[in-house]
């Protein structure tokens, strides 16, 4: 069964239809009479949250110390097999794999997410390339990590040049790293960026184009699925494509601080 995460922003509040990696319910899709109609989901993957205070983030060059312990490559995904991702095609949103790319396209006010199937990650380093075709202002896209259904982390890149991180727990959203500007975020479309995430234990470090951005320490979800998403926040469509996913093992133990006598 294909699984899909779609949210509709109607009357100022998000109405979402989504699919989950475990025990999920797929959204109802317009289909020919020969296809089976799927039930409707009610999970809100894009719940509202308070507007955080903006702070400035300097972009720094990545060093070996910022992503230590990277070991063997465990996933090389060229997006040649559509069965490995949640895909769907409808009038409001689509997640399709073609020409070795996963394309997410949404109409105004709609969101969509797609998870990589059959993979649960705990300590890892992942890289994925994103190409932005249609995107403006507060529209956004990014990656989902450690997803267990209605709970996950979302690293968000906005088309106004900001990045931030949210934790969604049982459909309740909380900003755990406030929006900051970054010169590595494409200011709208067209654009391209490589997103990297180093996750060990309760710490997650974000990299853009190989450059370290910031670190988040959050121990609520120790493991889960990996995915991608996009969201239209305005009155225009959004289209982004994802390609070249690579995932590596990470074997790293943080050094123990010696107590001061």
Predicted regions and their residues:
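Ser/Thr-rich, Proline-interspersed low-complexity disordered segments
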Residues: 18-72, 76, 248-261
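Short, tryptophan-glycine- and acidic/Ser/Thr-enriched carbohydrate-recognition patches
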Residues: 73-92
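Short tryptophan-centered beta-strand motifs in secreted/extracellular beta-sheet-rich domains
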Residues: 79, 126-128, 191-206
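Extracellular beta-strand elements of beta-rich domains used
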Residues: 79, 243-247
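Short carbohydrate-recognition loop motifs
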Residues: 93-112
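Secretory/extracellular carbohydrate-interaction modules
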Residues: 107-169
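Short, aromatic/His-centered strand-loop micro-motif at the edge of beta-sheets
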Residues: 171-196
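Flexible glycan-contacting loops in extracellular carbohydrate-active proteins
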Residues: 216-241
């Amino acid at each position: 069964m294909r699984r899909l995460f779609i949210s509709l922003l109607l009357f100022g509040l998000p109405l979402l239809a989504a699919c989950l990696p475990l025990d999920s319910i797929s959204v109802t899709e317009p289909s020919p009479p020969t296809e089976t109609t799927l039930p409707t989901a009610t999970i809100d993957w894009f719940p509202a949250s308070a507007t955080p205070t903006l702070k400035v983030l300097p972009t720094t060059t990545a060093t070996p110390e910022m992503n230590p312990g990277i070991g063997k490559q465990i996933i090389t995904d060229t997006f040649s097999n559509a069965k490995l991702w949640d895909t769907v095609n409808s009038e409001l949103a689509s997640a399709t794999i073609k020409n070795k790319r996963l394309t997410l396209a949404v109409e105004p006010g709609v969101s969509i997410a797609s998870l990589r199937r059959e993979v649960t990650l705990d300590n890892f380093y992942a890289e994925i390339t994103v190409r932005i075709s249609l995107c403006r202002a507060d529209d956004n896209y990014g990656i989902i990590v450690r997803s267990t259904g209605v709970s996950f982390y979302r690293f968000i890149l906005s088309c106004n040049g900001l990045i931030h991180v949210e934790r969604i727990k049982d459909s309740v959203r909380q900003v755990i790293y406030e929006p900051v500007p970054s010169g590595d975020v494409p200011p709208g479309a067209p654009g391209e960026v490589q997103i990297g995430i180093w996750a060990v234990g309760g710490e997650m470090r974000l990299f853009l184009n190989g450059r370290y951005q910031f670190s988040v320490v959050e121990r609520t979800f120790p493991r889960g699925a990996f995915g991608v998403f996009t969201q239209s926040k305005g009155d225009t469509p959004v289209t982004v494509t994802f390609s070249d996913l690579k995932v590596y093992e990470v074997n790293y133990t943080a050094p123990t601080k010696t107590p001061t006598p």
